[in-house]
C-alpha cells in the first residue's frame, strides 16, 4: 500500500502543495515584496526532479536541486551587479552584455556534467531577470538582488522541509536490486557469447547492459545527494561499474575468440554454461562452480574468459560491500586504489556552441522587439525567452522542451485567468482560502507532472508567474493579460529560434566520438606502468552511451565503437619492452590521434598519417623482438582502422 504507485503520486502531490503554500504563507508573513518568487521557486525545485523521474523523486534530489539553484542565483546576482555597475550609462550595451552572458552560461552548461548544468543555466537567466525587471528603477538594483535571493532561499527551504515532512524515498534498495540484476544480465551475455548468438541478438543484449550500467551510475549520484554516510558505497559502486564494463568487453571478445577457435571452451565449463540460471542466487552458485573449474583448467581456457571470471569475482565482492555499507576492507581498498578512471571530456563542443548562439540570438531578438515596440510587458517576454532557451538546450530534445513550455503557457492563460478574476479576489479576506485554492491547483498539476504530461511543468510555473501574489495584492487586468500574452510570445520566439538555428553538428559529434575510441585504443599502447593502470573504460563507455542516444538504430557505429573498446582492452594487457624508441613512438601516435579528434578540415590527412604510423609501429615491434601475440593485436587494430577509414577519417 505505502509503496504503491498511486500512493506515491498522491504523496508527492501533497508535498508539492505543501511546499508552495508554506513558501507563500511565510513570504506574506515576512513582508516580502513579491512572495510569488518564493512560491515559484518552491514549485520548480519540487516539481522539476519529479518530472524528470516520472514520479516521486528519491531522497536528496530536491535538496540537491535546491542547492544548485542557490548557487546559480548568487552567481547570477553577482553577474547582474557587475554588468550594471560597468554599463550604467549605456542601457543598450547593458542589455547586449546580458544576452552575451546568458549565451556564455548556456554554452558552459552544455559542456559540464548534466547534474551541474542547472547552476550555469540558472545563472544566465537570473542576471537577465534582475536587469530587465529593474530597468524602470535602476537605483534599486541592489535591493532587488537581495530580495530576489531572499525569496529564492525561502522557496528552497520550504521545498526541502516539505520533502522531509513527507518521508522521501531512499534509492538504496533500488541500487541493490539493480546491482543483482546487472550481474544476472552479465552472466546471460557470457552464456550467449559462448553458446552462439546472432549479431542482432548480441547487439540488443550488450546495448541493454550498457544502459543498465549507466543507470546505476546515475543512481549513485542520487545516493550521494541523499547522505554522506553512503560515501563508502559510492566508491564501491564506481569500481563495480568498471568491472561491469570489463565483463561486457571480455564477453564480446570471447565470442570473437570462439569464432576463430570453436573448441576453445569445451568440457565441463561448456556444459555448465549451457545450464540456465535466472535468479541472483543461481548465478552466484554457477560462478562459484565456474571458478573452481577454471582454476583446474586455466591454461586451456581463453584469457578473455579467465579475465571475465576475475572481473565477476571482484564485482561480487564489491556488490556485497555496497549492500551492507560496512567499513571498506583491506581487499576492497586494494581494488579501489588500483582503479584510476580517466575523466571523459565533452565531445559536444560544437553542439554547446550552437546552444550558446541560440540563447544569445533569442534574447537579442527579444531585446530588439521590446525596444522597438515599447511593450509594457516586454520584460516578461524577455524573461521567458531566457528561461526556455537556457533550460531546454541541455536536454536531449530542446525542441520538445520548448513545445512543453509553449503548451504550458497556453494552458496557464485560461487557468490563470480563472484564478485571477474569480478565485483570488474571493479569498482576499482569508489567507486560509487563498492557500486552499492554490494548494488545490498545485495538487492536480502535481499528479500530472509525475505522468510527464506534456505542458504540465510549464503550466505550473507559468500559472504562478502570472498571478499577482504580491504584497500588497493588486488586481490590474491589463497587466495580467500583458504578462500572460508575453509568456506565450516569449515561448513562440524561443521555439522559432530553435527551429531556425538548426543543430547540424550531429555528424561532427559522431566522428568526434568514434575518434575518441580510436584514441582510447592507441593510448593503451604504453611502456609506462602508471599510464597502463589508467582506466579508460568508464570514459569510453560513456561516449558509447552518448552515441547510443544521439544515433538510435545506427548499428554500424555501435559495433565499430565496441570493437575499438575491445581493442583497447586487449592492447592494455600487452607486455611491451621498456624502450625510449617505443615510448617516443607511443607519444607520437597519441599526438596524431589527438589531432584527428580536434581537426575538422585536415582530419583525413591526420588519419592517413596515423595509419602510416601504425604500419611503421608494427615493424618497430618486430625490430624489438616483441611477441607475435602483441604484433597480431596491433595488426588487428590497424586493419580495423583501414576498413573504417571513410567513417573515421573523411
From Swiss-Prot:
Source organism superkingdom: Bacteria
GO biological processes: carboxylic acid transport
Subcellular location: Cell inner membrane
Transmembrane residue ranges: 12-32, 42-62, 66-86, 92-112, 114-134, 151-171, 368-388, 405-425, 429-449, 454-470, 481-501
GO molecular function annotations of the record: transmembrane transporter activity
Keyword line: Cell inner membrane, Cell membrane, Membrane, Transmembrane, Transmembrane helix, Transport
A GO-annotated cellular component: plasma membrane
Protein name: p-hydroxybenzoic acid efflux pump subunit AaeB
Organism: Dickeya zeae (strain Ech586)
Amino acid at each position: 500500500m505505502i509503496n504503491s504507485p498511486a500512493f506515491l503520486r498522491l504523496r508527492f502531490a501533497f508535498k508539492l502543495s505543501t511546499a508552495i503554500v508554506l513558501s507563500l504563507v511565510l513570504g506574506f508573513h515576512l513582508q516580502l515584496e513579491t512572495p510569488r518568487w518564493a512560491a515559484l521557486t518552491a514549485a520548480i525545485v519540487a516539481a522539476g526532479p519529479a518530472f524528470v523521474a516520472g514520479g516521486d523523486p528519491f531522497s536528496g534530489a530536491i535538496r540537491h536541486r535546491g542547492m544548485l539553484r542557490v548557487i546559480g542565483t548568487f552567481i547570477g546576482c553577482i553577474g547582474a551587479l557587475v554588468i550594471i555597475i560597468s554599463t550604467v550609462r549605456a542601457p543598450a550595451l547593458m542589455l547586449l552584455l546580458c544576452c552575451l552572458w546568458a549565451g556564455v552560461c548556456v554554452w558552459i552548461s552544455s559542456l559540464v556534467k548534466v547534474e551541474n548544468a542547472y547552476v550555469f543555466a540558472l545563472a544566465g537567466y537570473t542576471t537577465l531577470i534582475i536587469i530587465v525587471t529593474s530597468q524602470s528603477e535602476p537605483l534599486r538594483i541592489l535591493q532587488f538582488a537581495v530580495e530576489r535571493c531572499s525569496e529564492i532561499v525561502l522557496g528552497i527551504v520550504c521545498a526541502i522541509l516539505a520533502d522531509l515532512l513527507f518521508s522521501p524515498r531512499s534509492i538504496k534498495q533500488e541500487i541493490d536490486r539493480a546491482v543483482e540484476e546487472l550481474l544476472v544480465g552479465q552472466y546471460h551475455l557470457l552464456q550467449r557469447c559462448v553458446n552462439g548468438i546472432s549479431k542482432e541478438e548480441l547487439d540488443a543484449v550488450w546495448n541493454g547492459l550498457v544502459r543498465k550500467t549507466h543507470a546505476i551510475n546515475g543512481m549513485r549520484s542520487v545516493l550521494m545527494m541523499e547522505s554522506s554516510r553512503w560515501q563508502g558505497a559510492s566508491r564501491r559502486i564506481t569500481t563495480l561499474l568498471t568491472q561491469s564494463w570489463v565483463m561486457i568487453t571480455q564477453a564480446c571478445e570471447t565470442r570473437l575468440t570462439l569464432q576463430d577457435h570453436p573448441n576453445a571452451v569445451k568440457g565441463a565449463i561448456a556444459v555448465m554454461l549451457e545450464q540456465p540460471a535466472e535468479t541472483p542466487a543461481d548465478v552466484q552458485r554457477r560462478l562459484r562452480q565456474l571458478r573452481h573449474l577454471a582454476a583446474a583448467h586455466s591454461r586451456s581456457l581463453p584469457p578473455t574468459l579467465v579475465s571475465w571470471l576475475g572481473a565477476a569475482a571482484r564485482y561480487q565482492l564489491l556488490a556485497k560491500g555496497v549492500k551492507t555499507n560496512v567499513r571498506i576492507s583491506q581487499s576492497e581498498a586494494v581494488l579501489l586504489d588500483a582503479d584510476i578512471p580517466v575523466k571523459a571530456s565533452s565531445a559536444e563542443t560544437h553542439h554547446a556552441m550552437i546552444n550558446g548562439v541560440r540563447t544569445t540570438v533569442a534574447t537579442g531578438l527579444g531585446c530588439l522587439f521590446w525596444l522597438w515596440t515599447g511593450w509594457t510587458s516586454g520584460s516578461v517576454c524577455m524573461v521567458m525567452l531566457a528561461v526556455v532557451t537556457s533550460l531546454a538546450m541541455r536536454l536531449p530534445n530542446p525542441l520538445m522542451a520548448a513545445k512543453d513550455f509553449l503548451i504550458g503557457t497556453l494552458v496557464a492563460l485560461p487557468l490563470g485567468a480563472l484564478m485571477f478574476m474569480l478565485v483570488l479576489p474571493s479569498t482576499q479576506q482569508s489567507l486560509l482560502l487563498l492557500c486552499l485554492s492554490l494548494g488545490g491547483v498545485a495538487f492536480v498539476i502535481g499528479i500530472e507532472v509525475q505522468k510527464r504530461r506534456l505542458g504540465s511543468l510549464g503550466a505550473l510555473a507559468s500559472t504562478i508567474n502570472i498571478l499577482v501574489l504580491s504584497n500588497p495584492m493588486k488586481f490590474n487586468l491589463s497587466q495580467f493579460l500583458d504578462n500572460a500574452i508575453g509568456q506565450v510570445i516569449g515561448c513562440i520566439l524561443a521555439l522559432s529560434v530553435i527551429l531556425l538555428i538548426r543543430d547540424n553538428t550531429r555528424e561532427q559529434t559522431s566522428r568526434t566520438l568514434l575518434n575518441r575510441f580510436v584514441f582510447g585504443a592507441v593510448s593503451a599502447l604504453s611502456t609506462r606502468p602508471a599510464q597502463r593502470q589508467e582506466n579508460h573504460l568508464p570514459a569510453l563507455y560513456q561516449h558509447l552511451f552518448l552515441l547510443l542516444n544521439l544515433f538510435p538504430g545506427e548499428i554500424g557505429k555501435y559495433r565499430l565503437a565496441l570493437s575499438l573498446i575491445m581493442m583497447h582492452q586487449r592492447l592494455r594487457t600487452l607486455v611491451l619492452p621498456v624502450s625510449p624508441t617505443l615510448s617516443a613512438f607511443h607519444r607520437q601516435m597519441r599526438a596524431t590521434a589527438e589531432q584527428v579528434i580536434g581537426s575538422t578540415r585536415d582530419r583525413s590527412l591526420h588519419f592517413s598519417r596515423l595509419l602510416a604510423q601504425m604500419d611503421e609501429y608494427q615493424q618497430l615491434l618486430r625490430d624489438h623482438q616483441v611477441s607475435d601475440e602483441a604484433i597480431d593485436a596491433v595488426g588487428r587494430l590497424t586493419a580495423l582502422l583501414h576498413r573504417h577509414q571513410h567513417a573515421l577519417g573523411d
